[in-house]
């Protein structure tokens, strides 16, 4: 079946057109264009300092855009206030999981998101239990967040994001702190998700296993 360009654009949850971002007069990102929809797993690869994290923050309205266009669910977003209504539908895991862990326990942390979405307490904790099981980290549920290893924090942060049922998932260097076994576990999990994912990474094996599309910065 062939869709018109208008139909394809409507199906894009995220569309970036000719995006340019500068800092202190230096170009960080130049003329970048891509779309995200369906179950696409789009990888952004590049060396440290190439702008991968900057791009993810720009997609949430946290970094100003010099030129170009960001569309979320068909709406052009230019100012910070334009992005605000969509942040509840976009899940992000930061490179440093400590930036988004609120604790005190792992179970409490994962339930925090649904509670913040006004989900009743009993249901929020049930959702948290489901995500613990889904990610295979039920054994951690009563652990204090600050006692976790780097890899355990990564999976806890991801469980917390998935508990809020995002429509788009953004992951910034998600294999940082993971050994080979847990990288394989993460790969299998992401492959099963039925939502579009944008992933920044310089882990070539991880990229090769998962990517449906790759862009380089």
Curated annotation (Swiss-Prot):
Cellular component, GO, one term: ATP-binding cassette (ABC) transporter complex
Keyword hit for Membrane: no
PROSITE patterns (UniProt xref): ABC_TRANSPORTER_2 (PS50893)
Keyword Glycosyltransferase: no
Keywords for this protein: ATP-binding, Nucleotide-binding, Transport
Record CDD domains: ABC_cobalt_CbiO_domain1 (cd03225)
Pfam families, per the entry: ABC_tran
Stored InterPro entries: AAA+_ATPase, ABC_transporter-like_ATP-bd, ABC_transpr_CbiO/EcfA_su, ECF_ABC_transporter_ATP-bd, P-loop_NTPase
GO MF annotations, alphabetized: ATP binding; ATP hydrolysis activity; ATPase-coupled transmembrane transporter activity
Residues bound to ATP: 46-53
Domain ABC transporter: 14-217
Family: Belongs to the ABC transporter superfamily.
Identification of the protein by name: Uncharacterized ABC transporter ATP-binding protein HI_1618
Organism: Haemophilus influenzae (strain ATCC 51907 / DSM 11121 / KW20 / Rd)
Lineage of source species: Bacteria, Pseudomonadati, Pseudomonadota, Gammaproteobacteria, Pasteurellales
């Amino acid at each position: 079946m062939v869709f018109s360009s208008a139909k394809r654009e409507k199906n894009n949850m995220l569309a970036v057109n000719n995006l340019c971002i500068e800092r202190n007069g230096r170009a960080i990102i130049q003329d970048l264009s891509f779309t995200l929809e369906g179950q696409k797993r789009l990888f952004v690869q590049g060396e440290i300092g190439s702008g991968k994290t900057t791009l993810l923050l720009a997609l949430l309205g946290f970094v100003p855009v010099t030129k170009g266009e960001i569309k979320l669910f068909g709406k052009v977003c230019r100012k910070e206030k334009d992005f605000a209504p969509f942040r509840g539908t976009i899940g992000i895991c930061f490179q440093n999981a400590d930036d988004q862990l609120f604790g005190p326990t792992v179970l409490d942390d994962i339930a925090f998101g649904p509670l913040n979405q006004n989900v009743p307490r009993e249901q929020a904790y049930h959702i948290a239990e489901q995500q613990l099981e889904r990610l295979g980290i039920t054994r951690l549920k009563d652990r204090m967040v600050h006692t976790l290893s780097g890899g355990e924090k990564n999976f806890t942060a991801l469980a917390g994001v998935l508990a809020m049922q995002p429509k788009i998932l953004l992951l910034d260097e998600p294999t940082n702190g993971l050994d080979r076994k847990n990288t394989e576990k993460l790969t299998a999990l992401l492959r099963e998700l039925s939502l579009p994912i944008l992933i920044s990474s310089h882990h070539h094996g991880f990229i090769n296993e998962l990517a449906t599309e790759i862009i380089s910065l």
